[in-house]
Design a protein with these regions (language model features):
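Active-site beta3 strand of CheY-like receiver
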Residues: 48-54, 58
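Short hydrophobic/Thr-rich beta-strand motif most characteristic of the beta2 strand and flanking loop
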Residues: 28-36, 43
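Conserved acidic segment of CheY-like receiver
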Residues: 4-15, 20-24
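Acidic di-acidic motifs
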Residues: 11-12, 55, 114
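Alpha4 helix (beta4-alpha4-beta5 surface) of REC/receiver domains from two-component response regulators
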Residues: 62-66, 89-113, 119, 123
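His-Asp phosphorelay/catalytic-motif detector in bacterial-type signaling
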Residues: 48-50, 75-81
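Non-catalytic signal-transmission and effector/linker regions of two-component phosphorelay proteins
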Residues: 1-6, 105, 113, 117-142
Length: 142
């Protein structure tokens, strides 16, 4: 895989984080976990992460949505791919790349539903990291 990719996971369920992090670490990724949305967002701002895995429902409600929107508004952080991991796909309109922007959509690059299938998780993480690397290479060559 070359250099080890750093992933940040923001989810308030330690048991879920432990299972998902083990799958990712066993696949060769470095995983940092934050269980509080504010700590997670601060870690993302100060760390050098290649991908964010983000839960929607945390703490006082749909705080993951607020984090995704903050990331979308930040000129540096918006380049970080976001993989939403949630059990509430039907209740929220997610915005995927290439779709028209609507104010109620949540910006993200991909979504996976809980419970997470390990092979699907690894497939989506790999695809997002490859797409991000390709975008960075294109940006740097211009």
């Amino acid at each position: 895989m070359g250099t080890q990719k750093r992933l940040l996971m923001i989810d308030d369920d330690p048991d879920f984080v432990e299972v998902v992090a083990k799958v990712l670490v066993d696949a060769g990724y470095e995983v940092d976990a934050k269980y509080n949305p504010d700590e997670g967002f601060n870690a993302l701002k100060t760390g050098d992460y290649d991908l964010l895995l983000l839960d929607v429902l945390m703490g006082r409600g749909a705080e993951g949505i607020m984090i995704a929107r903050k990331i979308g508004d930040d000129p540096v952080l918006r380049e970080t791919p976001i993989l939403i991991i949630t059990g509430m796909r039907e209740q929220i309109a997610f915005l995927f790349p290439g779709q028209p922007v609507h104010p109620s959509f949540v910006p993200n690059d991909e979504l996976i539903e809980k419970p997470v299938e390990p092979d699907l998780l690894l497939e989506k993480v790999s695809a997002l990291l490859e797409a991000s690397a390709k975008r960075k290479a294109e940006t740097e060559s211009n």
